[in-house]
Structures are given as C-alpha cells and as structure tokens.
C-alpha cells in the first residue's frame, strides 16, 4: 500500500504544476485558469499532466483575483 502511495505521489509531483509554470513565465501575462489550459495542452503531447489537472484547477481558482487584477 505504501509503494502505491509513493508511486502516485511521485507521478503527481513529476507531472509539474501547470499553474506554477504559467506564473513564473515572464513572457506571458497570467490569465484565468492558465494552469488548466497549460495542463490540457501538455496532456495532448503526453498524458501525465492530466493527473495535475485537479490541483491546477484549485490553485487557479485561488489565483482568480490575481488574474483579474492584471
């Protein structure tokens, strides 16, 4: 059971967080749900970012006031 938990945790961590990737990208303005859009774009290339989609959705929802302020 512990091995499964460690494996799933590693998959989520290694997939990266789309919201963080979009926040630290200085070339683009942060928009509402940019992390979710990034995850969906990356999921077309390889399926692992789909695991990060719920986490990016939550973080993007928290960051909505920041996106609106820009």
UniProtKB/Swiss-Prot annotation:
Compartmental location: Cell membrane
- Please tell me one Gene Ontology term that the record gives under cellular component: plasma membrane
Give the source's domain of life in one word.
Bacteria
Membrane topology listed for this record: Multi-pass membrane protein
Name the InterPro entries on file. Answer: DUF1375
Keyword annotations of the record: Cell membrane, Membrane, Transmembrane, Transmembrane helix
Transmembrane annotation, as ranges: 4-24, 48-68
Full protein name: Uncharacterized protein HI_0650
């Amino acid at each position: 059971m512990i091995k499964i938990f460690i494996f799933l945790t590693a998959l989520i961590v290694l997939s990266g967080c789309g919201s963080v990737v979009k926040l630290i990208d200085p070339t683009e303005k942060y928009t509402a749900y940019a992390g979710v859009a990034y995850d969906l774009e990356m999921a077309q290339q390889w399926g692992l970012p789909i695991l990060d989609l719920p986490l990016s959705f939550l973080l993007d929802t928290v960051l909505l006031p920041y996106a609106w302020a820009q």
